[in-house]
Amino acid sequence: FAGGIVSQRCLSCICKMESGCRNVGCKMDMGSLSCGYFQIKEAYWIDCGRPGSSWKSCAASSYCASLCVQNYMKRYAKWAGCPLRCEGFAREHNGGPRGCKKGSTIGYWNRLQKISGCHGVQ
C-alpha cells in the first residue's frame, strides 16, 4: 500500500472491508459503480487527484487505489474535522466528505472492527 496519513494496518482493514482485499471488479452501489480493492467510485477518484491512467485501472491496482485513499484523506479528513485515526478515515471513506460526522457510517466502522486483526486499529 501507499504511505501517507492512513496507517498500513488501517488501509488493510478498509481494503478487507470493501473487497476482502481482492480486485473484485466493479459493482453497482447506491446508484453508481464502485470498483476494485477499495470499491472506489469515479467521483472519489477525481477527488483524490486522478492517480494512474484511469479510474478503473487505478481501482484495480492495490497500490494506486491505496494512493487514492491516502490522497483523499489528506484532502478531506482534516478539513472535515475527522479524528486523524482509523475510525475517522474509515468513516470518511464510507461516507465521503464529512463522512466521519454522519451517523450512517457508524455501522461501517463497527463492522470493520470485527474483521480479524482490525479490532482497535488506529
Curated annotation (Swiss-Prot):
GO molecular function per UniProt: chitinase activity; lysozyme activity
Functional note: Has bacteriolytic activity against Gram-positive bacteria M.luteus. Also has chitinase activity.
GO cellular component, one term: extracellular region
Domain I-type lysozyme intervals: 3-118
Top-rank EC class of the record's enzyme: hydrolase
Keywords: Antibiotic, Antimicrobial, Bacteriolytic enzyme, Disulfide bond, Glycosidase, Hydrolase, Secreted
Binding site for substrate: 41-47, 72, 93-95, 102
EC number annotated for this UniProt entry: 3.2.1.17
InterPro entries to which the protein is assigned, alphabetical: Invert_lysozyme, Lysozyme-like_dom_sf
Protein's recorded name: Lysozyme
Active site: 18 (proton donor), 29 (nucleophile)
pH effect on activity, per entry: Optimum pH is 6.5 at 37 degrees Celsius for bacteriolytic activity. Optimum pH is 3 at 40 degrees Celsius for chitinase activity.
Further information: Unlike Ruditapes philippinarum lysozyme, catalytic activity is not affected by variation in salt concentrations.
Location(s), subcellular: Secreted
Catalytic activity as recorded in UniProt: Hydrolysis of (1->4)-beta-linkages between N-acetylmuramic acid and N-acetyl-D-glucosamine residues in a peptidoglycan and between N-acetyl-D-glucosamine residues in chitodextrins
Disulfide bridges in this chain: 10-86, 13-118, 15-21, 26-35, 48-68, 58-64, 82-100
Family: Belongs to the glycosyl hydrolase 22 family. Type-I lysozyme subfamily.
Subunit structure: Monomer.
Gene Ontology biological process: defense response to bacterium; killing of cells of another organism
